[in-house]
Design a protein with these regions (language model features):
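Non-catalytic C-terminal interaction segments of nucleic acid-processing enzymes
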Residues: 5, 23, 33, 51-104
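Conserved catalytic cores of phosphodiester-cleaving nucleases, focusing on short active-site segments
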Residues: 2-21
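Mg2+/Mn2+-dependent nuclease catalytic core
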Residues: 16-41
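A structural signal for short, well-ordered beta-strand segments and their strand-loop junctions
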Residues: 10-12, 48, 56-57
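Short secondary-structure boundary/capping segments within folded domains
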Residues: 1-3, 37, 46
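Short C-terminal domain-edge/linker segments immediately following a structured domain
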Residues: 39-45, 76-80
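Short, surface-exposed beta-edge/turn micro-motifs
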Residues: 7-8, 35, 42-45, 52-53
Length: 104
C-alpha cells in the first residue's frame, strides 16, 4: 500500500500484465484458507497496472462489479504459489464500467 499523508488516503497497487493475454483481471480473495486481497484490503483506492495502463478504482466499486454481475470465484494454483487460492476473474471490459473517471 501507498499512504498519501496530504490527503490521508491509501492506494493499493496491483500488477496484472497477464490480463493483456487473458482479457481478465485476477482479484484474489483467499489464500492459505484465509481472506486475502480484496477481502482484507483497507485501501481507499486500488490501482491495477495491466502492463500498459494504470486503472484507478475502489474496493467498493470492485465489490459492486462482482455482486451486480453475479461473478463467482474460481480456485487455482497460481504461478509461484504452493497452494490453491480463490480469486474473482473480472473481464477487463466489464471492470472498465467501474473505474474512476478523471484520473490520469
Amino acid at each position: 500500500d501507498i499512504w498519501i499523508p496530504e490527503i490521508s488516503k491509501s492506494v493499493e497497487v496491483k500488477s496484472d500484465e497477464k490480463s493483456l493475454e487473458t482479457g481478465n483481471f485476477v482479484i484474489e480473495i483467499e489464500m492459505f484458507g484465509k481472506p486475502s486481497g480484496l477481502l482484507k484490503s483497507k485501501a481507499d483506492y486500488w490501482v491495477i497496472f495491466d502492463g500498459i495502463n494504470f486503472l484507478w478504482t475502489t474496493p467498493t466499486k470492485i465489490f459492486e462489479c462482482i455482486l451486480l454481475n453475479k461473478i463467482n470465484y474460481v480456485s487455482f494454483i497460481g504461478n509461484g504459489d504452493s497452494q490453491r487460492k480463490k480469486a474473482i476473474l473480472i473481464k477487463k471490459e466489464l471492470l472498465g464500467d467501474y473505474l474512476l473517471r478523471g484520473i490520469k
